Amino acid sequence: MIDIKFLRENPDVVKQNIKNKFQDSKLPLVDEVIALDEELRQNKKRADDLRANRNKLSKSIGALMGQKKFEEAEATKKLVAEQAAELAKCEEKETELEEKVKNIMMVIPNIIDPTVPIGKDDSENVEVQKYGEPVTPAFEIPYHTDIMEKFAGIDLDAARRVAGNGFYYLMGDIARLHSAVISYARDFMIDRGFTYCIPPYMIRGGVVTGVMSFAEMDAMMYKIEGEDLYLIGTSEHSMIGKFIDQIVPEGELPYTLTSYSPCFRKEKGAHGIEERGVYRIHQFEKQEMIVVCKPEDSPMWFNKLWQNTVDLFRTLDIPVRTLECCSGDLADLKVKSIDVEAWSPRQQKYFEVGSCSNLGDAQARRLKIRVKGEGGTYLAHTLNNTVVAPPRMLIAFLENNLNEDGSVNIPVALRPYMGGTEKLVPKK
């Protein structure tokens, strides 16, 4: 959410930003919110005038009574009552206008970074760099669930009977591998100075609307019936939410947290849920990282965050590349975003395994995350990035470490988390 003062003073900049994001249907909202904001400010001025006059008249009643000017005192009391009634109407109108302004501001997209490439959708994202040499094996690589089944490591049919599509049972060596990757990612981030955090897996509605757009909320979040609670789609939500309504000392910044959590997503939209496979599902686990920092430090932290993911994947012998997300692919709160994609030898192409985003002060403005510095109080900047998200990451791991005989190599970095195992051997 952008600053209403910025919008008021720079309507053309906001409109051009909307055009750059190919959201032209939102263009009329700029003039609409400016008009509502002007009405709100005039209403507030009227309320302030009424309040001041009412208080002045109220104070005069005592003096009039002391001077035995009873008729004047009674007349003044009536005038105070009339002004109080008018003030109540103004205050009611103020609440109504504030809600209208807030609702419109919530759907006007954040101002994107000037370095973001202009494009309509993810097909126009721009490759930044490749890391590692993509593998083209001499043998055919099976679909990822077929690999897992050879280890008796997955049961989608049982999961479908229990919960429907979009769920899975992982077992045996594949389940161990899943847990090993999460544990390794946790320690990897701790070694890089991040504080490990186990957050709530449910958050209140006010936190949800503070960390994401209405469109994202509708497509992702599961609501608990009868409660003001939602299952998290990512632990970023609850980690950023930790700082809601806080004024933090500038000297304590940055806050760098990493967390493990289950994630729950409706995956409502064009992609939907896979009938077979674990690439897009309703429930999965993820190691996440977030940063709360000073505005001038957020570009530096942005580059550090996505580099962490690249470095981790390279220690697991998985080639990756980074993509700069174009304007049309950025969610409304994001200033800048880079996707990390892993190489799929089976498909001979890259696929997304993580996303790093700089939200600027958008989440901080909604959640009122403020910083107290020498020059006063200001809004923090927030950033987030996927460290690793099994089981999607397992697809890349299994394909890139698979041998022709069906065994899977365990990279050196992961062996301590697999009891020293160097290779997984299929059971079937």
Where on the chain are the PLM-derived regions?
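N-terminal alpha-helical targeting/anchoring segments
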Residues: 1-134, 149, 153
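TRNA-recognition modules of translation machinery and tRNA-sensing kinases, especially anticodon-binding
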Residues: 27, 130-428
